[in-house]
Design a protein with these regions (language model features):
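Intrinsically disordered, low-complexity linker/terminal regions across diverse proteins
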Residues: 30-34, 84, 234, 269-272, ...
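Noncatalytic, helix-rich "gating/capping" subdomain that lines the substrate-entry/channel surface
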Residues: 96-393
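N-terminal secretory signal peptides that target proteins for export/translocation
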Residues: 1-3
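Boundary at the C-terminal end of the N-terminal hydrophobic targeting segment
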Residues: 17-26, 30
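Bacterial N-terminal signal peptides
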Residues: 7-17
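Hydrophobic/aromatic-rich, well-ordered segments within soluble, folded domains that form packed cores
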Residues: 46-66, 195-218, 582, 589-594
Length: 688
């Protein structure tokens, strides 16, 4: 995936927990059980009744899907989830040990954080009492002139996501420096479309959202009439903000989200909001300029502040304070929040066990503290050394691929090769760990732990202003099951969490590892040359390095992918957005080709029969493609599929597998397909 590093206040769902110098009460909802081992190539997952040339995903994953229904505490279950659950269990082992018998001050810190989170008994006893100081701040607001200072306190001190995001990012046209930035935000539903589309499903969701808001206000003590009026205010304000929000697809274009302007321009866009008062209530120094990422949004926000009554604005702030805290308050709040956001929107049948939620929360707050011990126990040095060799092999293959492109001129190829040569690789974990010594954690006070963590994070980010960019910083924690390309750093990043089976396994043959982690590596590299990454140069600056003819040829080829994936239908009546998913689809296709090229190079060096030697009855090429498809094995709820089709830049696993192989003739050769079959179309889409 591609990540643009933008760090505002760390948003947490807050609550209070208490465990005076004792172990937190056991989680009554579940007892942690070590997940079963995971393997990279699973013959039993294959459904041999399916013709791989007709539906390769169903062939490679058919039996896995039949034998792995979605657990009741999930809305999606796939190979990523399998590894994620295993990594989370191993992280829990460290947290539980630190909560009961810490050996170092750092272990005590993250152990206390986890222990505080696990005290659900006290959360039930306290109800919404932990949130009363925040609600009192909102209630004290006596005029609109005080709104900006209050918003700053809610964002920075409490981590409450209201109106917009403020934080720090790399300057996209001068990547060596950090700048302040503001962007659209402030919506409770997943996307602007949920407010603006009038089809029956969206109308129903808005009705359910209002019902949720009414119930939330009533839990906080409002009567029926007041709760309904407040919910109406929330919907009206969020709908107005949604109308002023830039669509996701447009935000993929750096030019649409980069507006480096004087700080005073914010007052021109939104004069009803005192930006000077806002800034004075953050850790930020006086700003001369900043990136106003979505200018039209701030015009809409200004109209909201001007047109809505003070009481309506306070209802909006109050709702978001309650909503962000609800998952960690007493059981009625937790259940209500789960019922709408997970059950209604995502189709998840049951609440996730508290130990899982607290483990993930601790990783978010203190990820590089917990990660130090996790890496020592779960990521041996030889794993990093093996990854370094794989990355080098993939970089060599991508360079060869660029050189062989028939549609690109030598002039642009030279620039592309220079960008590839400038890639930086980060594998496993940071070279230098973050210092959490200034973050105070109390074993008996979760809500303030979360507030302090939010303030700690924004202070950490604001402190970067005016300083050189730290190119060694990570945007994911070590146990994360993911990987990313950061265009402003021109680097590829692979946390230790993903460097495990089914993606990477020491004992497996090269075909399996190249089909797993090899494709992931190639995927992240290709992001440097997709519809977004191709607009950044070797130094990470937005800068056109293409000839006009080559750019036109590139866009013609990517338009093929837009149309191809835009016709995939993950759920009845709803197709994928080919423009939203273009970057990930391009990276999937390019990553597959590059990894295959690298594998063939390795096999060629191993001897004459290496490319034909069968294991489990499959040639290396077949094992490569099956390994690739099996990392995408998954089952999804209908609700999850609908939300992700509208908001997720990644295609569902079925289309990530089939879409990539049907565009690659080498797949057809490996399985004896012929032109015209579904997995070997007459006119495949080929970019890289």
């Amino acid at each position: 995936m591609t990540i643009r590093r933008f760090a505002g206040a760390l948003i947490f769902c807050s609550s209070l927990a208490f465990a005076q110098n004792m172990v937190a009460p056991a989680d009554k909802s579940a007892t942690p059980v070590e997940p079963k081992p995971i393997h990279s190539f699973d013959v039993s997952a294959i459904d041999k009744s399916v013709d791989p040339c007709v539906d390769f995903y169903a062939y490679a994953c058919g039996n896995w899907r039949k034998n792995n229904p979605i657990p009741s505490d999930q809305s999606r279950w796939g190979r990523f989830n399998e590894l994620g659950e295993r990594d989370r269990y191993l992280l829990w082992v460290d947290l539980n040990r630190a909560a009961t018998d810490p050996k170092t001050p750092l272990q005590r810190k993250y152990g206390d954080f986890y222990a505080a989170c696990m005290n659900s008994d006290l959360a039930d006893k306290l109800g919404d009492k932990p949130l009363l100081p925040t609600l009192a701040l909102i209630e004290k607001l006596s005029d609109k002139q005080g709104l900006a200072a209050l918003v700053a306190r809610l964002q920075v001190d409490n981590g409450t996501p209201v109106f917009f995001r403020f934080g720090v990012e790399q300057d996209e046209k001068n990547s060596s420096r950090e700048i302040a930035a503001v962007y659209q935000a402030g919506l409770g539903l997943p996307d602007r479309d949920y407010y603006l589309l009038d089809d029956a499903r969206m109308t129903k969701i808005r009705e359910q959202y209002k019902e949720y808001a009414v119930a939330l206000f009533k839990l906080a003590g409002d009567n029926d009439e007041k709760a309904a009026a407040e919910a109406d205010s929330v919907l009206a304000i969020e709908t107005a903000l949604a109308k002023g929000s830039t669509p996701r697809v447009e935000l993929r274009d750096p030019a649409k989200r980069y507006h480096l302007l004087p700080f005073s321009d914010l007052s021109t866009l939104a004069p009803e909001f005192s930006w000077t008062a806002y800034l004075s209530n953050t850790p930020s120094p006086t700003l001369a300029e900043l990136n106003i990422g979505t200018p039209d949004f701030f015009k809409a926000m200004n109209a909201v502040i001007a047109d809505q009554s003070l009481d309506s604005l306070k209802s909006y702030l109050r709702f978001h304070a309650l909503n962000s805290a609800a998952p960690w308050l007493s059981s009625p709040y937790v259940d209500l929040n789960f019922g709408f956001f997970e059950k209604t929107l995502q189709g998840q049948a049951e609440q996730t066990a508290r130990w899982k939620r607290c483990t993930s929360l601790t990783d978010r707050a203190l990820g590089e503290a917990v990660g130090q011990d996790w890496v020592k126990e779960n990521f041996p040095p030889q794993a990093k050394a093996s990854m370094e060799k794989l990355v080098a092999a993939l970089e060599k293959a991508l360079n060869e691929d660029i050189q062989s492109l028939p549609w690109m001129t030598p002039e642009t190829k030279e620039q592309a090769e220079a960008k590839l040569a400038a890639f930086r690789e980060k594998i496993g974990y940071p070279e230098k760990w973050r210092d959490y010594s200034k973050l105070e954690v109390k074993r008996d006070d979760l809500i303030e732990n979360l507030h302090r963590a939010a303030a700690f994070q924004i202070d950490y980010e604001i402190n970067k202003l005016g300083k050189p960019v730290d190119e060694k910083e990570w945007s994911m924690t070590p146990p994360t099951v993911n990987a990313y390309y950061q265009p402003s750093n021109n680097d590829i990043n692979f946390p230790a969490g993903i460097l495990q089976p089914p993606f990477f396994e020491f004992s497996k043959d090269p075909a399996v590892n190249f089909g797993g982690i090899g494709v992931v590596i190639g995927h992240e590299m290709t992001h440097g040359f997709d519809d977004q990454g191709s607009k950044y140069d070797a130094k990470g600056n937005v800068n056109n390095w293409w000839t006009p003819a080559d750019r036109a040829a590139f866009e013609e080829r990517t338009s093929c992918e837009v149309n191809e994936y835009g016709n995939f239908e993950p759920v009845a009546g709803q197709k994928l957005n080919g423009k939203l998913t273009l970057g990930e689809n391009t990276a999937d296709n390019g990553g597959l080709r590059i990894a295959y090229r690298a594998l063939m190079s390795v096999l060629a060096s191993e001897g004459d029969d290496a490319a034909t030697r069968k294991i489990d009855g499959y040639t290396p090429a077949q094992r490569f493609f099956i390994s690739f498809a099996q990392i995408w094995c998954e089952n999804r709820t209908e609700q999850y599929s609908r939300v992700s089709a509208r908001t997720d830049p990644h295609s569902p696993g079925m289309f990530r597998a089939n879409g990539a192989v049907q565009n690659f003739d080498e797949f057809g050769k490996a399985f004896g397909c012929h032109k015209g079959q579904p997995m070997m179309p007459e006119h495949p889409c080929v970019v890289w």
